[in-house]
Swiss-Prot record:
Its main location: cytoplasm. This is U1 small nuclear ribonucleoprotein component SNU71. Keywords: Coiled coil, Cytoplasm, mRNA processing, mRNA splicing, Nucleus, Ribonucleoprotein, RNA-binding, Spliceosome. The gene is SNU71. Belongs to the SNU71 family. Residues 62-76 have a biased composition (Polar residues). Residues 55-89, 339-363 are annotated as: Disordered.
Amino acid sequence: MSNRDIVYVSPQAYLSSSQDWCLNSQQKGYIPILQNDLLNFKKILDLKKPKTTSINRDHENVASSNSKNSNTNHLGENNASTNGNNLNLQNLNDNINNNDVEKLSYQNMKLFHPISTIDQLYTVSLVGVPTALSDITLETIFKSISNDNVLSWSAFVSAVLDSKIVYLRFKSTLSKIEFKKTLLSIQSILESKDINLGELHYDSNVKDFLNSIDLKNEPIPNTSQEKLINTLVKIISENVPNSNDTKNKIDSDHPESYEIDLGTLSDIPSDSIEQLCKDIIDFRTKVIKIEREKKIKQSLEESRLSKQKLDKIFNQIKKTRNLTPIDSTKSMEGGVLAATATEEEARDDYEEEEDEDEDEEDDLKILNKSIAQEKEESNQRYLMLLNNLNKSIEPNLKKLSHSVLESTNYLDIITSNRSLFNKELQILSTDVYYDHNTSFRQEEIRKDDIDRELNPHVKLITTESIMSKSVEESKESLDKNEQASKSIITQNENISVTSDIKIKLAFKTKIDKSSEIYSSSETESDEEIKHLQTSIRESKNKTTDIVTSSGKDNSILTFTDDELQKRLTQLRESKIVDELVNEYLGVYEDELVDYIFDNIKENKNKHLLLVDLKETFDDDAIKIVDTIWKHQAMLP
């Protein structure tokens, strides 16, 4: 789950119609929820918005009490505490009757959650507070009994109980002594028999914190606050009615009117019972609201139809009254018949309207059906075109691209596959079913002549030109090998002059034989070329044997591994091997280039590399190996 799926919302900001109720970054007072749950969050708050607006109106009508003695909130002395209580006592009724409260310090339970350890130590709870007390009343009571030292408070309402738990958080600016004095004062007020505000509770950490505070000689606040207690009793009795009255006043749609049998929920954990009860009540209220809306719609529709019927009846009666006197007497005589006729006409009109509505519904169904049919046809056309693309168009394009590639590299393909073509021709010549006297031979000759006339600049490529070119290349390679062997022989003192003469004679005899073979006949050219290549290879093997026996040749690299690696990197950076492979092979091959470098690194031998490359490049392997070995990076 990414951070984009989470947003931070503030229920209070939403209920107060603030624009910053939803943020993408976390801030104090904002709750993280999934972005998909944002709509449900708004729906839930919209259901509660009327209640909050009524409370906000009460808040707006409430004004703060203008007290001149601003220092009466401190309980450092008895006089200060009693003055504060008297001040609260004077303004308590005014605050409730005139809604003279500044602003509710109530917070949602999620926002009220303590952030620091100081908040935990300054937080207590009141268990058993009546649910009938409104937020404004509780706010006024808390300010009066704590001398306006309550920072914020929150409440947890049970779905099955008539009381709620109120959490109070005092201001952290209070000193420890003042905090303990305030709690003692509240405890004394709550212990009164006439006041039903619940019991004061706090956890073990707060208890240890209070025990660590030593009042010493500090005066304990006066617990005889009879006037304040009497006023609180009066307020509670006015706002908390009897149980029988409340049951009669509860609306049937109110969630508190539902009674849930907790015996059926015995298998459910106790932690989730309250939430489940809330969900059940919400579900029931939603169902009732939906049913009520349906009934309202039905009643409105029935009233509309009945109104239409009555209007038609009245119109018919008006028409009958506007007749002539004679007609009117006749109509008076048959008044009953006219009334029945109007009723029948009204009934017929109503049936016609129903038929029209049914016709409209039928037209809508036909329209939707036609739209669905068109959509299905378009999908079928799309699938058919896609199938045609995959099975016909793309294979034809690949075939055409392959034929274009073959036509551009026509000469290379012929020379590389010459032996295969000759073998195919040989097989067809001996085939019984092959038509040697083809009827279209003359037509092919005619088209060939026309093509030659249209393209006179194209040179005719014959077997003789190809053979002569190959003979020249073989002679050049033999001359190079002869020169290399001469240089090696001159440097080597152990090689005799007779071996040099034998090598020269061997090269000359092979050259003479190759020239005689090419001049003999054209039909046996392929076999003679192969024989010539084998003879050339034998002569080259002889030269390699001579070179290896000499021992003074740079064909074997004597570099160390580190130095060889450096030289190979220089050779790779120069891209000379890539260019040679692309030039003689016609296509660039990464694997072949890597194979050449791996061979040089492992064997460090020029002739072994030449033998390996013979299979791929044939005679061009000599040029490739010589070019690599003459590169600056490979020189000693």
